[in-house]
Amino acid sequence: KRQLLARLAGELGEKQWLEDRVRYTTATEAAKLMRSSSPSGRRDYVDGKKEPKKIPANRAMQWGHEREDHILSEASRMSGIAIEHNHQVAVKSEDTRFAATPDGIGDDVVAEAKTFNIKVTDFLPDQYFYQMQWQMFVCNKKQCLYAYEVHEDYKPVVDEETGSSVHYRIIDRDDAVIKAMVSEVELALEQMNEVKESSDQIDDLIFKLAIA
């Protein structure tokens, strides 16, 4: 059973949001680590935890936020899969270091909504695939209802066959991929602990020299 923080993600103040960024490994972070699978990627992860920063909103992000509810509702109707829209942070009950915020949650499924410019040719980039795998891992689900809408200059493009601007795919959980992702995250967490221990030792040395 998933554990949900008693707090809506949309209601988080910047201070609390930054604290959560330090406390948990999110789906976005886990996906980036998996794509990189390198020491430099782990350094970026550690740096992000040391000095978390808000991602500045842009037009594309705002459009995605505005269209999210419609995309999920339409994908639910088209697929016949019942989902509830979600704005809460899910924390894995077996390991509270890991968290995710899927856009929707159903009985045995999570849901993720995206928007794409019509010029895009890859509607399932690795970053999104790994992100959904992490969401299924955290929420203990077997599938993800992946819904996306194509637009041209922020005007939805309706598909002639379906009569809808929304498309969907069912993404199955891949435990082998999840295992590899957890391994990458564990390596990054080990590196972060080493950096913290080194920093603590330096602080102790400075303190001892100061009082000597």
Where are these regions (language model features)?
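Short, well-ordered alpha-helical scaffold segments within catalytic/effector domains
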Residues: 68-72, 129-132
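C-terminal accessory segment of soluble enzyme catalytic cores
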Residues: 204-212
